[in-house]
Amino acid sequence: MQRNEVVQLTVVPKGLADPFPYILDYARGKRVLNVGASGGVENYLPTKRESWLHHRLGKVAAELVGIDIDSESVAFAAQHGINLLVADCEKCSFTQTFDLIVLSDVIEHVNSPLLAIKNLAKQLSPNGYLLITTPNPNHYGLVLRAWLGRHTEVYYDHVSALLPEHFQAISNRLGLKLCDVMFFSHLDRRSFENRLKSYLARLLGRLAPRCHGSLMVVLQLD
């Protein structure tokens, strides 16, 4: 939706306590393509397999295909019996279609988010879904840093920061339907400071969902 030259969301954003049950419900009994499947795989295999999104998707999906552009991480997964494909989501093509395509913290890495979404939409079955998670540019920590005059920390391979309104604009341009927008915060257990920040993000997110650390959008091939 557009008002004058400003994008208007067609859905009301919501807060989400835990994104994984939501993602797995979408994947249950479906043909699923997991894009960026080997991201962080070295942290999960072999001992923390149950926490790995690709493994969890495999438990509920009727069929699961995983791709990643990082050939080294794909090779690492293969050493542990996991078959993934080396592929670029901006260019890949399949002989089959998928009911659900998942991009979990991937879209901020790609050269062109719009081209990636456009190409992946071609791999969807009729009425299929694209489910995308990405860091939230309005995260309370970033706003606080701006107020305090501190520099913004950006990961070296993150090249875009997308708001829900950007996904609405992309959907409008590509003829997709924006079905849902949700904000959530992962619980970071790596240190006491990180846990404290996570709990604060969750607390503030209850009051204002856009304070959460991450966002999720669901796009449908309409």
Set out the residue ranges of the language-model regions.
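S-adenosyl-L-methionine-dependent methyltransferase catalytic module, highlighting the catalytic core
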Residues: 3-10, 16-18, 45, 90, ...
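N-terminal presequences and immediately downstream first alpha-helices
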Residues: 9-25, 32-37, 61
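Generic anion/oxyanion-binding catalytic loop in active/binding sites
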Residues: 21, 102-105, 156
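Conserved SAM-binding loop
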Residues: 28-143, 162-168, 215-221
